[in-house]
Amino acid sequence: MHTLIERLEKVTNSKELEEVRLNALGKKGVFADKFNQLKNLNGGEKNAFAKEIHHYKQAFEKAFEWKKKAILELELEERLKKEKIDVSLFNAIKTSSSHPLNYTKNKIIEFFTPLGYKLEIGSLVEDDFHNFSALNLPPYHPARDMQDTFYFKDHKLLRTHTSPVQIHTMQEQTPPIKMICLGETFRRDYDLTHTPMFHQIEGLVVDQKGNIRFTHLKGVIEDFLHYFFGGVKLRWRSSFFPFTEPSAEVDISCVFCKQEGCRVCSHTGWLEVLGCGMVNNAVFEAIGYENVSGFAFGMGIERLAMLTCQINDLRSFFETDLRVLESF
């Protein structure tokens, strides 16, 4: 048993310490073997041997705890030395990159602000008028349904799009107006391409009637999409939105397959990226504007980020998996 103490004294790390412990105190260790020998003894000889085993076992356990404490302190000191940072040296610490959503937001803002668009920020909590009625969304519109919108008890709601910011801006300012707004929006969806909270960016331009035409809208959108995606092809399609008339949706040539056809573009070669149109007169009437015209556009920031970062699952943006976030 003195050999166990001698082995313990020579231990230099946690691995060796564990090996000595198992050899001494394990189910097949030295002390277990000694206790098994008691069954072959009898009388006073058995009691004396048992007392001796307990004495040595207690001595070993005490020495083991002391050695364990010393080893842990030594290993901690060595680890701290390795992890020590010399603040006088050049900063070689790896810094994180911008989150894909922040990168996308900043890139959008960098395009529009030099063109004279003012960035407006609005409240996340809205009322029915600013979120629905002023935007020509009738009472029977499915977007008003409890299954699609988060409502509060006082008839307030979490905005379902950033369009209410446009309404507030028109109420607080007079034409000419040139603004963009971006931020969080909320809807009752959660799957590969939808999350309960997502980000939108919208733009609005309003001036005296006749000063703003669809050609102005088309020019801005085409310049932006070529700036953001590079040399992609564009396709305009007529569409319907209650708050714009006429309305259009814009597609870009698939950035994944170069229009050869893939699962992402449903083998069509095209990807939808935004909606736009000339502001419906019903919206201007709700605000109290007269003799004005304007255009508006809107797009999902996650949608743009998914295309540029080639991400298939929208939920990846909101999960804290560093392996995913560090890959961008």
Curated annotation (Swiss-Prot):
PANTHER family: PHENYLALANINE--TRNA LIGASE, MITOCHONDRIAL, PHENYLALANYL-TRNA SYNTHETASE. It holds the Pfam family Phe_tRNA-synt_N. It is an enzyme of class 6 (ligase). Mg(2+) binds at residue 245. Its main location: cytoplasm. It comes from Helicobacter pylori (strain P12). Binds 2 magnesium ions per tetramer. The lineage of its organism: Bacteria, Pseudomonadati, Campylobacterota, Epsilonproteobacteria, Campylobacterales. NCBIfam families: pheS (TIGR00468). PROSITE patterns: AA_TRNA_LIGASE_II (PS50862). It is found in: Cytoplasm. This is Phenylalanine--tRNA ligase alpha subunit.
